Amino acid sequence: MTEIVADKTVEVVKNAIETADGALDLYNKYLDQVIPWQTFDETIKELSRFKQEYSQAASVLVGDIKTLLMDSQDKYFEATQTVYEWCGVATQLLAAYILLFDEYNEKKASAPH
């Protein structure tokens, strides 16, 4: 009976790992399509290219816009890094959890601790 429960638990955890892996792939594909990084970089370059032609007021505004664009890119990469770190930790923990059931047997379970 206990072995059946262990097998079922291992299956649930394996499904969770596969689901998390699929979600991470979807996350990457979706964001790569939503955020046009090439256009993003080209916009920053174009704003810089014409900096000599801006008025004083316009140069302040364009500077603020460039700062916001670059800050948003930094925040995106920080958030993405956090997602990858959590996935890495979760994957290791779930793999260790599965090992507990792969090495499970009745003698070990009933042995005094």
From Swiss-Prot:
Signal peptide: none annotated. SUPFAM superfamilies: Bacterial hemolysins. GO terms for biological process: hemolysis in another organism. InterPro entries: Hemolysin_E. It comes from the Bacteria. Pfam families: HlyE. Belongs to the hemolysin E family. This is Putative hemolysin E-like protein.
